[in-house]
Structure formats: structure tokens, C-alpha cells
């Protein structure tokens, strides 16, 4: 019984996180992998998701209520936060966003191949992972 309830709660949390992160159509497919409270850091949790961008896919401007660590798994992506230049990252490269960064550009660098990233978000428990840029 506990295992079934726990599994259902994890699935629901993953669905909520995916809704939090996913933007408009073409922005990418978010796949929740894990959300876990951090032992020894009261009130904080880590969430891991993959985001797969279709060819030419992009997200609208947004901000995360989290420190976000991005690792490019496949393809290449272009990232830009306010005050910084656009950066093109290839598979095997990483990127960091702080909670105060407005993420202006997050897109697949290719119009012909998909791109996939792993995002690890460290945030307050229960806080939305993503909010629109203001």
C-alpha cells in the first residue's frame, strides 16, 4: 500500500513539475526524473528533468525559482541570461542559472536535429520551478 501511494505521489509531483517548466508548443518536452528533499538543508529540494527541444524549438523568456545546472546531453542549445551574451553549448557542456537570472534565450541551435538537456534545479520545497519573465 505504501509503495503504491508513494509511487502515485511521485508521479503527481512529476506531472506538476512538468507543467511548471513547460512553455508553449515547440518549447520542448519536459520529462521529470526525480524530486527529492535535501537532507540537512531544511526546506530545500532538488528536481531533475530532461528537456528535449525539437528542431528549431525554443522556450519563451522565463526565470527559475532555483539554482539551475544544465548539462547538454544531445545536440546543441543556445542559452542567454540578462546581462550576458548568447552562449552555444554542445553535448557534454554545462551552464548555470541563478534564481535572479532572467533566461531570455533557451533554444535548440539546430533547425534539423533535436537537442536534449538535463536540468537539475535546487529550490525551495513546493515553490514553482519556473515563472514567466516580467
Segments the model singles out, each with a brief description of its role:
Residues 2-47, 80, 96, 114, ...:
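A short, N-terminal "cap"/entry segment at the start of jelly-roll beta-barrel domains
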Residues 43-48, 67, 84, 100, ...:
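Extracytoplasmic
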Residues 44, 56-71:
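A short beta-loop-beta micro-motif enriched in histidine and acidic residues
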Residues 41-43, 63, 88, 109-114:
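Extracellular/periplasmic catalytic domains that process cell-envelope and extracellular macromolecules
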Residues 58-60, 78, 95, 99-108:
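Histidine-centered metal-chelating micro-motifs
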Residues 86, 100-126:
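Ligand-binding loop in jelly-roll beta-barrel domains
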Residues 66-83, 93:
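Glycine- and acidic-residue-biased ligand/ion/polar-headgroup-sensing regions
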Residues 53, 83-100:
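Short acidic-glycine-tyrosine-enriched beta hairpin
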Amino acid at each position: 500500500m505504501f509503495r503504491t501511494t508513494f509511487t502515485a505521489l511521485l508521479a503527481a509531483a512529476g506531472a506538476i513539475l512538468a507543467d511548471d517548466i513547460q512553455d508553449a508548443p515547440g518549447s520542448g518536452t519536459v520529462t521529470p526524473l526525480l524530486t527529492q528533499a535535501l537532507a540537512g538543508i531544511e526546506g530545500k529540494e532538488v528536481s531533475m528533468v530532461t528537456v528535449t527541444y525539437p528542431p528549431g524549438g525554443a522556450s519563451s523568456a522565463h526565470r527559475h525559482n532555483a539554482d539551475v545546472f544544465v548539462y547538454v546531453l544531445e545536440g546543441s542549445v543556445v542559452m542567454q541570461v540578462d546581462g550576458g551574451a548568447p552562449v552555444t553549448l554542445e553535448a557534454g557542456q554545462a551552464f548555470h542559472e541563478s534564481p535572479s537570472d532572467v533566461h531570455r534565450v533557451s533554444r535548440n541551435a539546430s533547425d534539423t536535429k533535436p537537442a536534449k538537456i538535463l536540468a537539475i534545479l535546487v529550490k525551495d520545497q513546493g515553490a514553482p520551478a519556473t515563472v514567466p519573465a516580467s
